[in-house]
Amino acid sequence: MTIVYLSLGTNMGDRAAYLQKALEALADLPQTRLLAQSSIYETTAWGKTGQADFLNMACQLDTQLTAADFLKETQAIEQSLGRVRHEKWGSRTIDIDILLFGEEVYDTKELKVPHPYMTERAFVLIPLLELQSDLKLPPNHKFLRDYLAALDQSDITLFSAQQTEF
């Protein structure tokens, strides 16, 4: 089994409902168990301004799937929830990013793990560290909380403090 950490985000429609539907779909993945979810945070858009605010959260799973198969499953969930990939950093019904896949490192066209921008995004690190405060970034094993300490967190507000274990 491999412990996987995901970031989920949405800024279209009923944002909280999209997060819930994504969590339900993740919990139903084959050979995978949803272990925990973070609180939900509201943040301004990153990368492209002038769009609606995002709701962001993280979750922790345990899977027997390969990283490539897990990516295919998360992309299928995104598509089933209406995700259309037409613009980089554009609005979306749901975005599911693989942040960490065990201690593994991937650098392919399809998959980059650890996620290449995670250390630059407080809206990713805050919910992620809520799940596991002593996470380290492979392969250098620097604490993720050290990256967070260097980031501006002023535009991130708690939306829902629900933290559920499965």
From Swiss-Prot:
GO molecular-function term, one example from the UniProt record: 2-amino-4-hydroxy-6-hydroxymethyldihydropteridine diphosphokinase activity
Ranges in a coiled coil: none
Enzyme Commission code(s) on record: 2.7.6.3
SUPFAM superfamilies, A to Z: 6-hydroxymethyl-7,8-dihydropterin pyrophosphokinase, HPPK
One Pfam family matching this protein: HPPK
PROSITE patterns: HPPK
Any one of the GO BP annotations: folic acid biosynthetic process
Catalytic reaction list: 6-hydroxymethyl-7,8-dihydropterin + ATP = (7,8-dihydropterin-6-yl)methyl diphosphate + AMP + H(+)
KW DNA-binding (keyword) present: no
Keywords of the record: ATP-binding, Folate biosynthesis, Kinase, Nucleotide-binding, Transferase
Entry's family note: Belongs to the HPPK family.
Protein name, entry field: 2-amino-4-hydroxy-6-hydroxymethyldihydropteridine pyrophosphokinase
Species the sequence originates in: Streptococcus pyogenes serotype M6 (strain ATCC BAA-946 / MGAS10394)
